[in-house]
UniProtKB/Swiss-Prot annotation:
Residues 44-87 are annotated as: Disordered. Gene3D superfamilies: 1.20.5.340, Porin, LamB type. Pfam families: LamB, Sugarporin_N. Its main location: membrane. Keywords: Cell outer membrane, Ion transport, Membrane, Plasmid, Porin, Signal, Sugar transport, Transmembrane, Transmembrane beta strand, Transport. Homotrimer. The keyword Methyltransferase does not apply. This is Sucrose porin. GO terms for cellular component: cell outer membrane; pore complex. GO terms for biological process: monoatomic ion transport; polysaccharide transport. It is found in: Cell outer membrane. The gene is scrY. It is a multi-pass membrane protein. It comes from Salmonella typhimurium. Residues 62-72 have a biased composition (Low complexity).
Length: 505
């Protein structure tokens, strides 16, 4: 009985243990399945979140791409507008107005009229100028009207007309003594698209004009070289990056052109070469039958006048004060023979002899000396022989110095000293007498400007001035109809006072 009970209990325990073990395994599996399901759910959630983020990112990328495209389009539009504006800014098409004028009044120390002008000395007849500051009483005006256009093919056109007038009268109405004159009227054609090689970018011109590359010494009112007339030519033929040339043909008339018997014309063929700061200019002149030209009374004007001539210029244009300091300077050596012996105004003097020879040197510079002081020296000298009569001689030299002392931005004190020596032997031509001697001029001029007070080339200016002049007594005898020695204007010292305006734009 005991063994049966014991066996029954053992069987019951084993059965219970197996059942408990089985129950434990099922619970563990269910727990694992639940955990796995939870992890799967979390993974799905994370995947969904990632998918949402990816969608948002893709949408943002699409938005950015669209914005970038919009910005690109906007940038292109801005670039196109900018290009159009730049083209419009560069396009100088339209009308322009430019001008030059000077006008003033002058008197001597007695409150009466006096002589003045840059060419009042005997040397002035052959181009010997002196300082102009406080030494001009005329009214002279130049008015320039231009029309420019740029075509779609890049070609340019320019038309210019200049009207000028000069007066010595102080009256407001001067029509009866007016010298109103059309000094220039010409057309230029530039950047022609069919021009290639050296002619690419060159400019054709024709008409009545001052040559583009003339230059002067402003303080003594003298051109270094002045080529002008009616004709045609071409500018800026470029042989290489450093060498360019101009070629032109000008025509001028000698004598009274109203005289129907005067058919003498002077033709000037010019080559003008530029290599960096260097300039080399050569001209040939011809005036057929100039020695047979008659005046308005039918008399022979000058039987020994030249029919041909040559002219040459060697120039140096510096962008510094003779290479020594900041500033600018220009220097030129000129030579002329025959009709070319008038070396400043090429082809303007029909009385020159076939054997006439002239040498001239010209130089000027500008430089600041300090914050308030600036200086502009100038020199002009000439030697001419066999000019109008056999054996004649005209020698002179001018030295000029102008100083500017800036007081403030609108007021300066200008000082000018001018000295000229001359030795003239005209050999009786035009009843002129042989003389030699010196001329002196000193000027003090308080000056008002709107700005750039120390700039020698900025205008407008209003000047109040006083000048003192004196000269060798012998110079009074040069001619009966010139300034020196005339009534009330003799050596021994002459004072003058005045006010003048000058402007250009």
């Amino acid at each position: 009985m005991y063994r049966k009970s014991t066996l029954a209990m053992l069987i019951a325990l084993l059965t219970s243990a197996a059942s408990a073990h089985a129950q434990t395994d099922i619970s563990t599996i269910e727990a694992r399945l639940n955990a796995l399901e939870k992890r799967l759910q979390e993974a799905e959630n994370r995947a969904q979140t990632a998918e949402n983020r990816a969608g948002a990112a893709e949408k943002k990328v699409q938005q950015l791409t669209a914005q970038q495209q919009k910005n690109q389009n906007s940038t292109q539009e801005v670039a196109q507008r900018t290009a159009r504006l730049e083209k419009k800014a560069d396009d100088k098409s339209g009308f322009e107005f430019h001008g030059y004028a000077r006008s003033g009044v002058i008197m001597n120390d007695s409150g009466a009229s006096t002589k003045s002008g840059a060419y009042i000395t005997p040397a002035g007849e052959t181009g010997g100028a002196i300082g102009r500051l406080g030494n001009q009483a005329d009214t002279y005006v130049e008015m320039n009207l231009e029309h420019k256009q740029t075509l779609d093919n890049g070609a340019t056109t320019r038309f210019k007309v200049m009207v000028a007038d000069g007066q010595t009268s102080y009256n407001d109405w001067t029509a009866s003594t007016s010298d109103l004159n059309v000094r220039q009227a010409f057309v230029e054609l530039g950047n022609l698209p069919t021009f290639a090689g050296p002619f690419k970018g060159s400019t054709l011109w024709a008409g009545k004009r001052f040559d583009r590359d003339n230059f002067d010494i402003h303080w003594i009112d003298s051109d270094v070289v002045f080529l002008a007339g009616t004709g045609g030519g071409i500018y800026d033929v470029k042989w290489n990056d450093g060498l360019r040339s101009n070629f032109s043909l000008y025509g001028r008339n000698f004598g009274d052109i109203d005289d129907s018997s005067n058919s003498v014309q002077n033709y000037i063929l010019t080559m003008n070469h530029f290599a960096g700061p260097l300039q080399m200019m050569v001209s040939g002149l011809r005036a057929k039958d100039n020695d047979e030209r008659k005046d308005s009374n039918g008399n022979l004007a000058k039987g020994d006048a030249a029919n041909t001539g040559v002219h040459a210029l060697l120039g140096l244009h510096n962008d510094s004060f003779y290479g020594l300091r900041d500033g600018s300077s220009k220097t030129a050596l000129l030579y002329g023979h025959g009709l070319g012996a008038e070396v400043k105004g090429i082809g303007s003097d029909g009385a020159l002899r076939p054997g006439a020879d002239t040498w001239r040197i010209a130089s000027y510079g500008t430089t600041p000396l300090s914050e308030n002081w600036s200086v502009a020296p100038a020199m002009l000298a000439q030697r001419s022989k066999d000019r109008y009569a056999d054996g004649d001689s005209y020698q002179w030299a001018t030295f000029n110095l102008r100083l500017i002392q800036a007081i403030n931005q609108n007021f300066a004190l200008a000082y000018e000293g001018s000295y000229q020596y001359m030795d003239l032997k005209p050999e009786g031509y035009n009843d002129r007498q042989a003389v030699n001697g010196s001329f002196y001029k000193l000027t003090f001029a308080p000056t008002f400007k709107v700005g750039s007070i120390g700039d020698f080339f900025s205008r407008p200016e209003i000047r109040f001035y006083t000048s003192w002049m004196d000269w060798s007594k012998k110079l009074n005898n040069y001619a009966s109809d010139d300034a020196l020695g005339s009534d009330g204007f003799n050596s021994g010292g002459e004072w003058s006072f005045g006010v003048q305006m000058e402007t250009w734009f």
